[in-house]
């Protein structure tokens, strides 16, 4: 009971207004005597349903939107509706949106708890109609996103269409319920367009990799006190330098061996100088680099993200390795028979540097998906809903590996001197090895066509759902046509896709 404390003036005014009975208006004799009245309850307004099928909707039940009559500067009343559904959702602040059965071209993000009813006629007054509002924005966007919020969104009498994807590997998804969202779809058509083909992977290179530098010639006999061997050539590759072996130096006192090629791959040995053999010997050829392994094709599948779907790309190839430089040639001894000329021997030619390894091809991109509804750990109920998916995109082809660079030519040994006895020539260096072939890449997986795609264990509850799917995308070819393992797998065409 609530005690009414009235001033004398107020009491007299009340008595006067009530006549001369001496009792308060609205009170019986007993409460009038004690100046107390029972506590009253203010009547509440009408219940405002999110779905008009659940009860009567009045003008003050929510925010009203019309693509043709509205303006986003309006308050969102029936007399002054807003133009876009996003503005209506923002103004609703957890309440209801009632949309005229027209086409809306802007995507909308709905916090769970905001509801949208799309079955309204608005030309000359608002009333229910058997037509539905359509949401059909441009390509490469998800028309409807539902994110976590403070309640459950009721989405009724809507037609939602996603356009064909145009970005490489892009997906066409009509609606996406993100992590933590809760929503119920009633009398809704969700239609996805076609997923886009994945982009091909880049080739390692059109031209072969950098060739090894050629070796240098040694000094001729009797041209200097020390006939210098050819200097070591070098080339810088992605995985380090390849260097030809230096040519041996020749003098009256020594005939040096040539240097070994770098990196040490078991070949490219420097030739012997004349002191260690009846005559000098040439350097041996450098070892070739290793070919890079090819990348494998992508398996079918993909990942559901806040942006939609990411397909599986093929594996990149591995680069070829640099080759070894050739060994340097050995030198000859100098002799007094050079006469008045310097008594140096002939220097050996240096080995050619090895060629660089080819760069790898890059994996083909996965094809885009066509999915009517994506559910990412969300609570979704479908009632009287039609789900239609288009075709998945083809996986991109893998890139081809780059050919390895040719090995450098060997330097020639220094010339002999025709004297008696003659001074012998220096020996040639070895050829640089050939760089390894870059590995080719795998093709991307084909994109799926699915009515519903969801994470493990989070399938929507369904009642009266009609699902139609298109064709799955084919897998992309590998960059090496002869490698069967390089082809990507085809996508899946299923009503329910669990990822």
Residue ranges and their predicted role:
Residues 163-172, 191-371, 389-450, 464, ...:
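Glycine-centric low-complexity/flexibility signal
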Residues 85-86, 93-127, 139-140, 389:
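N-terminal extracellular ligand-recognition/capping segment immediately after the signal peptide
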Residues 61, 95, 106, 112-114, ...:
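The right-handed parallel beta-helix/beta-solenoid scaffold, focusing on the short coil/turn
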Residues 114-170, 186, 194-197, 205:
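Right-handed parallel beta-helix/beta-spiral solenoid domain characteristic of secreted/periplasmic
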Residues 113, 118, 152-162, 182-194, ...:
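Right-handed parallel beta-helix
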Residues 15-17:
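C-terminal motif of bacterial Sec signal peptides marking the signal peptidase cleavage site
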